Amino acid sequence: SLRDFNPDDKKLFVRIESPNEYPNYFFRNLDGELNQITYFANPFKSIQNVHKEVIKYKREDGLDLSATLYLPDGYNFSQKEKLPMIMWAYPREYKDKSSASQITKNPNQFTYPYAGSPLYWLTRGYAVLDNVAFPIVGEGNKQPNDDFRVQLVSNAKAAIDKVANLGYVDIDRIAVGGHSYGAFMVANLLSHSNYFAAGIARSGAYNRTLTPFGFQSEERNYWEAPQIYYNMSPFMHADKLKSPILLIHGEADNNSGTYPLQSERYFNALKGLGATARLVMLPKESHGYRAKESILHMLWEQDTWLENYVKNKKEIN
């Protein structure tokens, strides 16, 4: 990518990267000659050679969707072993289908795992479907959330159908995960579909009546659209939860839409109804987790959950 241009020296200042090459900076002259400026080493050697591709597919209503599929280093494409998979996503609202279908993923970007990334599980033998498109579309006078649940489940089905057709994934061992509004998505999917073996929901909101003056892109208040708030709230459908769910929340979350009460009350409802659920509260953490101890414990909790309820699901059953 171009960072600067010096017309007098006829030089470009550029950053060069690839899926397995850490970004570094160079001068490039108009003849194409490169002069490297930085020599940053790749700190993520364990996932340096994983397979990465942007996959494209269609939803039932014809909407074009995409996601980034990762397979572990050394995956044998001729044998096509069916792997457990983690799907990670975040729903977004749109007012037209063309905007919802835009592809913003670049397969040539360096594979950079952040603290809460699902990519670490590539080293544990999982496939990872990251940045999965989850558009919620409302065109004309229709608002996106008018059929939120239907579109949410349809997005999940389209992604699972695609990876199933590719032949890399065991569709009986798929987990779904998300943070914040992504956690809200997870709880809804586990309540209204049978596609997932387990879920991981971090710092989410599960009772929309506790955010009565709107949330995300929803501008209607509770009193204007009570049925929408009810239908979208996993808390109201806690009796329908079909798969084990891991709830993680910062004990000091001050984000107005995701106070810790959301996870605490949802967990109480799930346990009272006999669901398989675990609640982890991280001390002194807000909406995003910062302390090394918190991040490492979060990763341990997620790994334990995935190993028990996804990878080794058949052995447990």
Feature map (PLM): residue ranges:
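Non-catalytic accessory segments flanking enzyme active sites
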Residues: 1-78, 116, 123
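Residues that line or immediately flank small-molecule/substrate-binding pockets and catalytic motifs
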Residues: 16, 29, 41, 90, ...
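Exposed loop/turn and edge beta-strand positions of beta-sandwich/beta-sheet ligand-binding modules
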Residues: 51, 63, 83, 170, ...
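Short hydrophobic segments within beta-strands
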Residues: 70, 88-89, 177, 248
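Short beta-strand element of the alpha/beta-hydrolase
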Residues: 71, 79-93
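Short beta-strands and strand-coil junctions in structured, solvent-facing domains, enriched
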Residues: 75-77, 95, 254-255
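Active-site-proximal cap/loop segments of hydrolase catalytic domains
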Residues: 98, 102-317
